[in-house]
Amino acid sequence: MPLIVDASVTVAWFVRNQATGYTDRIRRQARKERLHVPAIWPLEFANALWQLERRRLLSGRQVDTIVDLVEPLEIAVHGESPPPRRLLALARDHDLSAYDASYLDLALRLRYPVACRDGPLRKAVRAAGAKLA
């Protein structure tokens, strides 16, 4: 089944000190499944890598290598963002950031499980009747 993956999970595939058994399992599953992300994902992914580089936890060369490895993955970026009213409703109902609400919205629309490590988003996915990967 296709998966919705958040940026922290995808970063953990390439940054070993951020990997967990969960992210490793999702990485193996992702090799066989189509991945889906909301429009915010490229910004979050790039920002996470930039923060790691900026703090000198990764070199610029390592970050560039990660980007080279991610680009060929079949990640469907859903460019249409939900209307602000929809994001606000989900954020209010589940005490989420608008960014996390975009992942929840995508999960509810596509009915695909969400792979994330974020506690509030995991709780919201369950509460909204969506599935976790």
Give the label of every model feature segment.
Residues 5-6, 18, 36-39, 95-97, ...:
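Histidine- and aromatic-rich ligand-binding microenvironments
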Residues 9-10, 41, 83, 103, ...:
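Alpha-helix capping/helix-boundary segments
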Residues 1-40, 52-65:
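Short, well-structured N-terminal submotif of metal-dependent ribonuclease cores
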Residues 22, 44, 86, 123-124:
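Phosphate- and divalent-cation-binding pockets in alpha/beta enzyme and binding domains
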Residues 46-74, 86:
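Active-site-proximal, substrate-binding regions of enzyme catalytic domains
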Residues 2, 104-133:
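Acidic, PIN/NYN-like endoribonuclease modules and their adjacent C-terminal/linker elements
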